[in-house]
Amino acid sequence: MSLVVLTNIPTPYRTAFFDALAEEAARAGRRFHVLYCAKTEPGRHWPYVASKMRHAHTVLRGFHPSLTGIHAHLNPGVLAELNLLKPDTLILAGSWNTPTMLVAGLNIYSPPPRRFFWSEGHADAVLHKSGLIAWLRRRVYRTFDGFAVPNAKSAEWAVAQAGSPRQVVTLPNAIDAKFFARPSAASRQEARRHLGLEGEGRVLVQVSALTARKGVLELANAFLGLSAAERRGAKLLLVGEGDLRSQLETLAVGSDGAVRVLGQLPPEEVRRVLWAADAFVLNTRLDPNPLSAIEAAAAGLPVVLSAAAGNVREVVEVPQTGFVIRDAADPSEALRAVLNASEVQLAEMGARSAELARTQFDAPAVARSLVKQLYP
Protein backbone atom coordinates (compact mmCIF):
# COMPACT_ATOMS: atom_id res chain seq x y z
CA MET A 1 0.00 0.00 0.00
CA SER A 2 1.39 3.41 -0.86
CA LEU A 3 0.86 7.13 -0.56
CA VAL A 4 1.57 9.29 -3.62
CA VAL A 5 1.66 13.08 -3.86
CA LEU A 6 1.29 14.76 -7.26
CA THR A 7 2.47 18.37 -7.20
CA ASN A 8 3.78 21.04 -9.54
CA ILE A 9 7.49 21.58 -8.73
CA PRO A 10 9.99 20.81 -5.97
CA THR A 11 10.47 23.73 -3.59
CA PRO A 12 12.78 23.80 -0.55
CA TYR A 13 9.95 23.86 1.98
CA ARG A 14 8.01 21.08 0.24
CA THR A 15 10.99 18.78 -0.36
CA ALA A 16 12.06 19.02 3.29
CA PHE A 17 8.54 18.02 4.32
CA PHE A 18 8.45 15.18 1.81
CA ASP A 19 11.74 13.87 3.22
CA ALA A 20 10.14 13.77 6.68
CA LEU A 21 6.94 12.25 5.29
CA ALA A 22 8.92 9.47 3.60
CA GLU A 23 10.44 8.52 6.96
CA GLU A 24 7.08 8.54 8.75
CA ALA A 25 5.41 6.54 5.97
CA ALA A 26 8.17 3.93 6.16
CA ARG A 27 7.65 3.60 9.92
CA ALA A 28 3.97 2.95 9.23
CA GLY A 29 4.82 0.32 6.61
CA ARG A 30 3.73 2.49 3.68
CA ARG A 31 5.59 3.30 0.49
CA PHE A 32 5.78 7.00 -0.39
CA HIS A 33 6.45 8.62 -3.75
CA VAL A 34 6.18 12.15 -5.15
CA LEU A 35 5.38 12.96 -8.78
CA TYR A 36 6.54 16.41 -9.89
CA CYS A 37 5.07 18.03 -13.01
CA ALA A 38 8.28 19.98 -13.70
CA LYS A 39 11.62 20.93 -12.17
CA THR A 40 10.76 24.63 -11.98
CA GLU A 41 8.40 27.39 -13.14
CA PRO A 42 8.95 30.96 -14.35
CA GLY A 43 9.58 33.29 -11.43
CA ARG A 44 10.66 30.46 -9.13
CA HIS A 45 14.31 30.79 -8.16
CA TRP A 46 15.04 27.47 -6.45
CA PRO A 47 17.46 25.02 -8.09
CA TYR A 48 16.48 21.38 -8.52
CA VAL A 49 19.12 19.20 -6.82
CA ALA A 50 17.98 15.58 -6.83
CA SER A 51 20.92 14.43 -4.70
CA LYS A 52 19.64 16.48 -1.76
CA MET A 53 16.15 14.97 -1.86
CA ARG A 54 15.74 11.94 0.39
CA HIS A 55 12.28 10.91 -0.81
CA ALA A 56 11.46 8.74 -3.82
CA HIS A 57 10.28 10.95 -6.64
CA THR A 58 9.82 11.26 -10.38
CA VAL A 59 9.87 14.41 -12.52
CA LEU A 60 7.30 13.77 -15.23
CA ARG A 61 7.92 14.67 -18.84
CA GLY A 62 5.46 17.17 -20.20
CA PHE A 63 4.51 20.53 -21.64
CA HIS A 64 4.45 23.70 -19.57
CA PRO A 65 2.69 26.60 -21.32
CA SER A 66 2.44 30.02 -19.67
CA LEU A 67 -0.36 32.48 -20.32
CA THR A 68 -0.93 35.82 -18.56
CA GLY A 69 1.12 34.76 -15.57
CA ILE A 70 -0.53 31.34 -15.23
CA HIS A 71 1.86 28.41 -15.55
CA ALA A 72 0.10 25.20 -16.56
CA HIS A 73 1.40 21.64 -16.70
CA LEU A 74 0.35 18.88 -19.06
CA ASN A 75 2.08 15.58 -18.34
CA PRO A 76 0.57 12.84 -20.55
CA GLY A 77 2.50 10.11 -18.72
CA VAL A 78 0.94 10.77 -15.32
CA LEU A 79 -1.63 7.97 -15.65
CA ALA A 80 1.05 5.45 -16.60
CA GLU A 81 3.09 6.43 -13.54
CA LEU A 82 0.08 6.14 -11.27
CA ASN A 83 -0.71 2.73 -12.75
CA LEU A 84 2.81 1.58 -11.86
CA LEU A 85 2.69 2.99 -8.34
CA LYS A 86 -0.94 2.00 -7.66
CA PRO A 87 -1.37 4.20 -4.57
CA ASP A 88 -4.17 3.57 -2.13
CA THR A 89 -4.11 7.30 -1.34
CA LEU A 90 -3.34 10.09 -3.82
CA ILE A 91 -2.85 13.69 -2.70
CA LEU A 92 -3.11 16.30 -5.46
CA ALA A 93 -1.25 19.50 -4.63
CA GLY A 94 -1.30 22.61 -6.77
CA SER A 95 -3.94 24.40 -8.81
CA TRP A 96 -7.22 22.51 -9.14
CA ASN A 97 -7.40 23.43 -12.84
CA THR A 98 -3.92 22.24 -13.83
CA PRO A 99 -4.43 19.81 -16.75
CA THR A 100 -2.25 17.14 -15.14
CA MET A 101 -4.29 17.27 -11.93
CA LEU A 102 -7.50 16.84 -13.91
CA VAL A 103 -6.09 13.90 -15.88
CA ALA A 104 -4.96 12.26 -12.63
CA GLY A 105 -8.61 12.10 -11.60
CA LEU A 106 -9.32 9.43 -14.21
CA ASN A 107 -9.57 6.00 -12.59
CA ILE A 108 -7.54 3.52 -14.64
CA TYR A 109 -7.09 0.77 -12.07
CA SER A 110 -9.29 -0.88 -9.47
CA PRO A 111 -9.82 -0.18 -6.70
CA PRO A 112 -9.17 3.52 -7.33
CA PRO A 113 -7.19 5.48 -4.73
CA ARG A 114 -8.68 7.83 -2.22
CA ARG A 115 -8.14 11.24 -3.78
CA PHE A 116 -7.40 14.20 -1.52
CA PHE A 117 -6.93 17.73 -2.81
CA TRP A 118 -4.33 19.72 -0.89
CA SER A 119 -6.30 22.94 -0.72
CA GLU A 120 -4.83 26.14 0.70
CA GLY A 121 -7.53 28.41 -0.73
CA HIS A 122 -10.21 30.10 1.33
CA ALA A 123 -13.05 32.55 0.80
CA ASP A 124 -10.90 35.64 1.43
CA ALA A 125 -8.21 34.59 -1.04
CA VAL A 126 -10.19 33.26 -4.00
CA LEU A 127 -10.04 35.30 -7.21
CA HIS A 128 -13.26 34.05 -8.85
CA LYS A 129 -16.17 33.86 -6.41
CA SER A 130 -18.83 33.53 -9.10
CA GLY A 131 -19.23 32.85 -12.80
CA LEU A 132 -17.98 30.06 -15.02
CA ILE A 133 -14.65 29.48 -13.28
CA ALA A 134 -16.34 29.25 -9.88
CA TRP A 135 -18.84 26.75 -11.30
CA LEU A 136 -16.06 24.62 -12.80
CA ARG A 137 -14.14 24.72 -9.52
CA ARG A 138 -17.13 23.41 -7.60
CA ARG A 139 -17.56 20.59 -10.13
CA VAL A 140 -13.93 19.55 -9.71
CA TYR A 141 -14.02 19.80 -5.90
CA ARG A 142 -16.99 17.42 -5.85
CA THR A 143 -14.84 14.70 -7.41
CA PHE A 144 -12.46 14.54 -4.44
CA ASP A 145 -12.88 12.11 -1.56
CA GLY A 146 -11.37 14.54 0.90
CA PHE A 147 -9.20 17.57 1.47
CA ALA A 148 -5.86 18.24 3.11
CA VAL A 149 -5.97 21.78 4.51
CA PRO A 150 -3.63 24.03 6.52
CA ASN A 151 -6.16 25.92 8.59
CA ALA A 152 -9.81 26.32 9.57
CA LYS A 153 -10.53 28.88 6.84
CA SER A 154 -9.38 26.46 4.17
CA ALA A 155 -11.37 23.57 5.66
CA GLU A 156 -14.61 25.57 5.61
CA TRP A 157 -13.96 26.73 2.06
CA ALA A 158 -13.12 23.30 0.62
CA VAL A 159 -16.14 21.54 2.11
CA ALA A 160 -18.42 24.38 0.97
CA GLN A 161 -17.08 24.04 -2.58
CA ALA A 162 -17.67 20.28 -2.52
CA GLY A 163 -21.27 20.83 -1.48
CA SER A 164 -21.39 17.91 0.96
CA PRO A 165 -19.29 16.54 3.85
CA ARG A 166 -15.85 15.16 3.00
CA GLN A 167 -12.99 13.78 5.06
CA VAL A 168 -10.70 16.63 6.05
CA VAL A 169 -7.14 16.12 7.26
CA THR A 170 -5.04 18.89 8.74
CA LEU A 171 -1.86 19.60 6.79
CA PRO A 172 -0.23 22.91 7.68
CA ASN A 173 2.76 24.17 5.75
CA ALA A 174 5.75 22.50 7.36
CA ILE A 175 9.20 23.92 7.98
CA ASP A 176 12.56 22.81 9.31
CA ALA A 177 12.25 24.53 12.68
CA LYS A 178 15.83 23.67 13.65
CA PHE A 179 17.17 25.38 10.52
CA PHE A 180 15.56 28.71 11.41
CA ALA A 181 15.94 28.55 15.20
CA ARG A 182 18.31 31.23 16.48
CA PRO A 183 21.21 29.32 18.11
CA SER A 184 22.15 31.96 20.68
CA ALA A 185 21.61 35.55 21.71
CA ALA A 186 25.01 36.38 20.25
CA SER A 187 23.90 35.18 16.81
CA ARG A 188 21.56 38.18 16.56
CA GLN A 189 24.41 40.62 17.02
CA GLU A 190 26.59 38.66 14.60
CA ALA A 191 23.83 38.75 11.98
CA ARG A 192 23.40 42.49 12.51
CA ARG A 193 27.12 43.10 12.05
CA HIS A 194 27.05 41.14 8.80
CA LEU A 195 24.17 43.30 7.51
CA GLY A 196 25.67 46.56 8.74
CA LEU A 197 22.94 47.09 11.33
CA GLU A 198 25.05 47.51 14.45
CA GLY A 199 23.76 50.13 16.84
CA GLU A 200 20.55 50.64 14.88
CA GLY A 201 16.99 50.85 16.18
CA ARG A 202 14.50 48.05 15.75
CA VAL A 203 14.70 46.03 12.57
CA LEU A 204 11.53 44.89 10.80
CA VAL A 205 11.67 42.50 7.86
CA GLN A 206 9.20 41.31 5.24
CA VAL A 207 10.15 38.25 3.18
CA SER A 208 7.89 37.95 0.15
CA ALA A 209 7.54 38.55 -3.55
CA LEU A 210 7.85 42.27 -4.24
CA THR A 211 4.42 42.48 -5.85
CA ALA A 212 1.17 44.34 -5.31
CA ARG A 213 -0.40 41.19 -3.85
CA LYS A 214 2.07 41.27 -0.96
CA GLY A 215 1.32 44.89 -0.06
CA VAL A 216 4.97 45.93 -0.18
CA LEU A 217 4.46 49.49 -1.41
CA GLU A 218 1.76 50.14 1.17
CA LEU A 219 4.06 48.79 3.86
CA ALA A 220 7.05 50.88 2.82
CA ASN A 221 4.97 54.05 2.48
CA ALA A 222 3.27 53.49 5.84
CA PHE A 223 6.63 52.88 7.51
CA LEU A 224 8.13 56.04 6.02
CA GLY A 225 4.94 57.92 6.92
CA LEU A 226 5.58 57.38 10.62
CA SER A 227 7.21 60.27 12.40
CA ALA A 228 10.89 60.10 13.32
CA ALA A 229 9.84 59.87 16.96
CA GLU A 230 7.66 56.85 16.18
CA ARG A 231 10.32 55.09 14.12
CA ARG A 232 13.15 55.85 16.56
CA GLY A 233 15.80 54.76 14.10
CA ALA A 234 13.98 51.61 13.02
CA LYS A 235 14.77 49.97 9.70
CA LEU A 236 12.53 48.06 7.28
CA LEU A 237 14.23 45.31 5.27
CA LEU A 238 12.52 43.84 2.21
CA VAL A 239 13.67 40.43 1.00
CA GLY A 240 12.43 39.07 -2.32
CA GLU A 241 12.06 39.79 -6.01
CA GLY A 242 9.20 41.13 -8.10
CA ASP A 243 7.90 43.78 -10.46
CA LEU A 244 7.73 46.46 -7.75
CA ARG A 245 11.40 46.24 -6.88
CA SER A 246 12.41 49.35 -8.83
CA GLN A 247 9.71 51.46 -7.16
CA LEU A 248 10.78 50.18 -3.75
CA GLU A 249 14.42 50.93 -4.50
CA THR A 250 13.43 54.48 -5.42
CA LEU A 251 11.71 54.82 -2.05
CA ALA A 252 14.75 53.32 -0.34
CA VAL A 253 17.13 55.81 -1.96
CA GLY A 254 15.14 58.70 -0.51
CA SER A 255 14.65 57.11 2.91
CA ASP A 256 18.08 57.91 4.35
CA GLY A 257 18.63 54.21 5.00
CA ALA A 258 15.31 53.57 6.74
CA VAL A 259 14.20 51.16 4.00
CA ARG A 260 16.54 48.61 2.43
CA VAL A 261 15.73 46.30 -0.48
CA LEU A 262 17.87 43.17 -0.24
CA GLY A 263 16.41 41.28 -3.21
CA GLN A 264 16.21 37.52 -3.62
CA LEU A 265 18.41 35.64 -1.15
CA PRO A 266 19.28 31.95 -0.64
CA PRO A 267 17.74 30.23 2.41
CA GLU A 268 20.86 30.65 4.56
CA GLU A 269 20.90 34.39 3.94
CA VAL A 270 17.15 34.71 4.58
CA ARG A 271 17.77 33.00 7.89
CA ARG A 272 20.54 35.46 8.72
CA VAL A 273 18.18 38.38 8.03
CA LEU A 274 15.53 36.84 10.31
CA TRP A 275 18.11 36.38 13.05
CA ALA A 276 19.05 40.06 12.74
CA ALA A 277 15.45 41.28 12.95
CA ASP A 278 13.31 42.29 15.93
CA ALA A 279 10.00 41.46 14.24
CA PHE A 280 8.60 40.02 11.02
CA VAL A 281 5.95 41.76 8.92
CA LEU A 282 3.77 40.40 6.11
CA ASN A 283 1.37 43.00 4.75
CA THR A 284 -0.23 40.64 2.26
CA ARG A 285 -3.46 41.59 0.50
CA LEU A 286 -4.25 38.05 -0.66
CA ASP A 287 -2.55 34.94 0.73
CA PRO A 288 -4.07 31.53 1.44
CA ASN A 289 -1.36 30.26 3.78
CA PRO A 290 1.94 32.17 3.84
CA LEU A 291 4.93 30.08 4.88
CA SER A 292 7.28 32.98 5.54
CA ALA A 293 5.38 33.91 8.70
CA ILE A 294 5.90 30.39 10.06
CA GLU A 295 9.63 30.51 9.25
CA ALA A 296 9.87 33.83 11.07
CA ALA A 297 8.10 32.29 14.07
CA ALA A 298 10.69 29.50 14.10
CA ALA A 299 13.39 32.18 14.27
CA GLY A 300 11.74 33.43 17.46
CA LEU A 301 10.31 36.64 16.02
CA PRO A 302 7.06 38.41 16.87
CA VAL A 303 4.86 38.25 13.77
CA VAL A 304 2.95 41.22 12.36
CA LEU A 305 0.55 39.57 9.92
CA SER A 306 -2.24 40.80 7.67
CA ALA A 307 -5.77 39.68 8.47
CA ALA A 308 -5.97 38.61 4.80
CA ALA A 309 -3.56 35.73 5.49
CA GLY A 310 -5.37 32.43 5.77
CA ASN A 311 -3.33 31.31 8.77
CA VAL A 312 -3.50 34.54 10.77
CA ARG A 313 -5.60 32.90 13.47
CA GLU A 314 -3.31 29.89 13.89
CA VAL A 315 -0.04 31.83 13.68
CA VAL A 316 -0.82 35.12 15.46
CA GLU A 317 -4.24 35.57 17.05
CA VAL A 318 -4.65 32.41 19.14
CA PRO A 319 -1.03 31.95 20.29
CA GLN A 320 -0.63 35.73 20.76
CA THR A 321 2.67 35.90 18.95
CA GLY A 322 2.37 39.41 17.54
CA PHE A 323 0.01 41.91 15.96
CA VAL A 324 -2.64 41.78 13.23
CA ILE A 325 -2.74 44.24 10.33
CA ARG A 326 -6.46 44.90 9.96
CA ASP A 327 -6.18 46.76 6.65
CA ALA A 328 -3.29 46.03 4.28
CA ALA A 329 -3.92 49.38 2.57
CA ASP A 330 -2.68 51.09 5.74
CA PRO A 331 -0.62 48.99 8.18
CA SER A 332 0.40 52.06 10.23
CA GLU A 333 -1.47 51.00 13.38
CA ALA A 334 0.23 47.60 13.53
CA LEU A 335 3.63 49.17 12.81
CA ARG A 336 3.17 51.59 15.70
CA ALA A 337 2.16 48.69 17.94
CA VAL A 338 5.28 46.64 17.27
CA LEU A 339 7.58 49.66 17.50
CA ASN A 340 5.99 50.77 20.80
CA ALA A 341 6.04 47.31 22.40
CA SER A 342 8.55 46.85 25.19
CA GLU A 343 11.56 44.58 24.85
CA VAL A 344 9.94 42.23 27.37
CA GLN A 345 6.72 42.05 25.34
CA LEU A 346 8.61 41.30 22.13
CA ALA A 347 10.70 38.65 23.87
CA GLU A 348 7.58 36.93 25.23
CA MET A 349 5.92 36.98 21.80
CA GLY A 350 9.08 35.65 20.19
CA ALA A 351 9.30 32.79 22.68
CA ARG A 352 5.69 31.82 21.97
CA SER A 353 6.42 32.00 18.24
CA ALA A 354 9.36 29.62 18.51
CA GLU A 355 7.37 27.14 20.60
CA LEU A 356 4.47 27.29 18.13
CA ALA A 357 6.76 26.58 15.18
CA ARG A 358 8.46 23.70 16.98
CA THR A 359 5.27 21.94 18.08
CA GLN A 360 2.81 22.72 15.28
CA PHE A 361 4.79 23.34 12.08
CA ASP A 362 8.05 21.38 12.29
CA ALA A 363 8.21 18.92 9.37
CA PRO A 364 8.56 15.67 11.38
CA ALA A 365 5.61 16.59 13.62
CA VAL A 366 3.41 17.53 10.64
CA ALA A 367 4.38 14.36 8.75
CA ARG A 368 3.65 12.17 11.79
CA SER A 369 0.24 13.78 12.20
CA LEU A 370 -0.66 13.36 8.51
CA VAL A 371 0.20 9.65 8.44
CA LYS A 372 -1.88 9.06 11.57
CA GLN A 373 -4.85 10.90 10.05
CA LEU A 374 -4.66 9.01 6.75
CA TYR A 375 -3.97 5.61 8.30
CA PRO A 376 -5.47 5.61 11.82
What is the meaning of each model-derived region?
Residues V4, E198-K214, A220-L224:
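Conserved donor-binding/catalytic core segment of Leloir-type glycosyltransferases
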Residues S246-E268:
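Nucleotide-activated donor-binding/catalytic signature segment of Leloir-type glycosyltransferases, i.e.
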Residues R285:
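Aromatic "clamp/platform" in nucleotide-sugar-dependent glycosyltransferases that forms part
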Residues S95-P99, P113-G131, T143-G146:
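A short, histidine- and acid-enriched strand-loop-helix "catalytic/donor-clamping" loop
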Residues T170, A308-P319, F323-V324:
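Short acidic/histidine- and often glycine-rich active-site loop of Leloir-type glycosyltransferases
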Residues P302-S306:
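Short hydrophobic beta-strand element within catalytic cores of glycosyltransferases
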Residues R138-R188:
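Donor nucleotide-sugar binding/catalytic pocket of nucleotide-sugar-dependent glycosyltransferases
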Residues E317-A329, A337-E343:
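Conserved acidic donor-binding segment of nucleotide-sugar-dependent glycosyltransferases
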